[in-house]
């Protein structure tokens, strides 16, 4: 079966889920997790996308992202950039990611808040921490500043 064609440009905000190859817990080591965060934040600083929320779990990641390129290119940079560096810098051999990813366009403020809460609560739901702020590989970490909610998603009382 062919992969779905996505023609998404940078005009939307998306909830993303991508899994490791065969759901292996490849991202549970601190070295792999820190490298992933470095790649994720590096491409953000290069203005390839706006990053609103994220969590890196042992076998997958979730993002709330507004691509400034196409969605496909943003995910190619993240997944491909991480794979390249993991193999080069950490000597990893083998497949890291499943080929596809799940995306859902965020339509409104309520969806944005629901996805944000889901991302922040994911480590708690998986019994990795008691509160989201204690999980070191997420945007819930105190003091981490990410990109603001896109204006088009804000309710009118927050837009003013």
Task: Map each language-model feature to its residues.
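Short catalytic/metal-binding and nucleic-acid-binding patches
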Residues: 1-160
